């Protein structure tokens, strides 16, 4: 039983690392910047989704009234689906949380 738990833990962490390695270089660079900054509360994370058949990367806001960001695979900012004073973002990308699928946490600050 102990070995099964160990194998499960190792495989979970290696899957996250493998997903991160397939992320575009610009997203990996953003993660490098996050790692060089003090740990946030809540911890910073990057979540990959498929949105309208394309890979996108959602970065949640770190604090109240700030926008969350969604980037495409070239780090073009697509919009802010949530956050801001209303919590509703800027309305872009349109229907993000309804249409986005296959979420994968590719990085979370676990310091």
Regions from the language model: what does each represent?
Residues 32-79:
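Mature extracytoplasmic domains of secretory-pathway proteins
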Residues 1-4:
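Positively charged n-region of N-terminal signal peptides that target proteins for export
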Residues 83-111:
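C-terminal partner/receptor-binding element of secreted or periplasmic proteins
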Residues 16-18:
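Bacterial signal peptide processing site
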Residues 12-14:
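C-terminal motif of bacterial Sec signal peptides marking the signal peptidase cleavage site
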Residues 23-42, 100-106, 110:
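N-terminal domain-onset segments
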């Amino acid at each position: 039983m102990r070995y099964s738990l160990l194998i499960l833990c190792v495989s979970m962490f290696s899957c996250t690392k493998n997903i991160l390695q397939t992320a575009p270089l610009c997203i990996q660079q953003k993660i490098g910047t996050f790692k060089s900054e003090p740990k946030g509360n809540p911890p910073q994370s990057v979540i990959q989704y498929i949105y309208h058949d394309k890979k996108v990367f959602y970065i949640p806001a770190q604090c109240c009234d700030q926008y969350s960001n969604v980037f495409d695979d070239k780090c073009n900012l697509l919009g802010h689906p949530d956050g801001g004073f209303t919590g509703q973002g800027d309305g872009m990308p349109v229907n993000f949380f309804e249409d986005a699928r296959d979420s994968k946490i590719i990085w979370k600050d676990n310091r």
